[in-house]
């Protein structure tokens, strides 16, 4: 029993370390461990006294399920988060449950509802709550994916001001990447690369986190791909391809994972750009099977049921 308690304490410390460093995983705490450890540890934290730890741990677990490609389990967990928050009359819990719902919608490409969930989450958090900054990053990312760039920048500006005050904050790299992606989408690749180089400098000199390296490489490749498209620059296309292949090697163990699918989709665009249509088609067929389409419809039904529950509950008077 003592040995189990010691192990549980070590696992909880490892998970809390991920949360404090604002990273989804690390070399010692991979995705599968986050899921299994949280299943064991979260129930021990389910009380008003430890509600922040409890709901944040569950949020990290939802992210882990999404990254692993288990969207159905992520949706179930988001539903459980919301029900727990309601049972505990926890405004903080409802905020994080909404963020989890938003992440599940984002992964399902239901962007309007994802945005609505994120804004609901923001409504339940005070402006100076540390969770607010992470949420602003997610809202900016989503708005950029929706091509609502100027709206996205209204969320990036307070993040930039926050970063000026706390340049070594754990969200520094995600905030710099938000700036970079804005400039990639705006067609200013040189400015985007400058932000990515700043992020890389923090990674090289301070964080050394695999998740940070992955994000920096992914968006640097996107920048190179845009440069290749704008200037028909084959060298940049080759550099982008080399980065995508490097990243795919890291995630090829699970072809259902969000990262594998995102990078494969980027490779499709790149191959089309290079006129390598057969290779683009091969990847497309691997990614988009009939089974997957059916699964996607099932996810959408699940997620709509979850949001419907939330909207009905919203009409009930709740005292915090």
Question: What do the PLM-derived regions correspond to, one by one?
Answer:
Residues 9-13, 52, 92, 130, ...:
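Residue signature of alpha-solenoid helical repeat architecture, marking inter-repeat boundaries
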């Amino acid at each position: 029993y003592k040995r189990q308690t010691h192990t549980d304490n070590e696992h909880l410390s490892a998970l809390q370390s991920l949360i404090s460093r604002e990273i989804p995983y690390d070399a010692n705490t991979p995705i599968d461990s986050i899921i299994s450890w949280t299943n064991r540890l979260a129930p021990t934290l389910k009380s008003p006294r430890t509600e922040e730890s409890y709901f944040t741990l569950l949020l990290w677990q939802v992210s882990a399920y999404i990254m692993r490609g288990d969207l159905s389990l992520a949706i179930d967990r988001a539903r459980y988060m919301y029900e727990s928050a309601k049972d505990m009359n926890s405004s903080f819990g409802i905020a994080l449950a909404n963020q989890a719902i938003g992440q599940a919608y984002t992964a399902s490409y239901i962007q309007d509802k994802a945005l609505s969930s994120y804004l609901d989450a923001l409504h339940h958090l005070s402006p100076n709550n540390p969770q607010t900054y992470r949420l602003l990053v997610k809202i900016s990312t989503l708005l950029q994916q929706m091509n609502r760039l100027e709206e996205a920048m209204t969320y990036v500006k307070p993040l930039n001001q926050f970063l000026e005050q706390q340049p070594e904050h754990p969200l520094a790299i995600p905030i710099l990447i938000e700036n970079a992606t804005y400039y990639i989408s705006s067609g200013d690749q040189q400015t985007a690369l400058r932000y990515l180089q700043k992020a890389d400098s923090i990674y090289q000199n301070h964080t050394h986190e695999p998740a940070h390296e992955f994000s920096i490489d992914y968006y640097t490749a996107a920048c190179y791909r845009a440069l290749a498209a704008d200037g028909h620059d084959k060298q940049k296309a080759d550099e982008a391809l080399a980065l995508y292949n490097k990243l795919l090697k890291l995630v090829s163990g699970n072809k259902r994972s969000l990262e594998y699918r995102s990078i494969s989709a980027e490779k499709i665009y790149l191959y089309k750009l290079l006129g390598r249509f057969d290779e683009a088609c091969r990847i497309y067929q691997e990614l988009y099977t009939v089974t997957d389409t059916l699964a996607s419809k099932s996810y959408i039904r699940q997620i709509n049921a979850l949001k419907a529950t939330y909207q009905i509950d919203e009409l009930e008077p709740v005292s915090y």
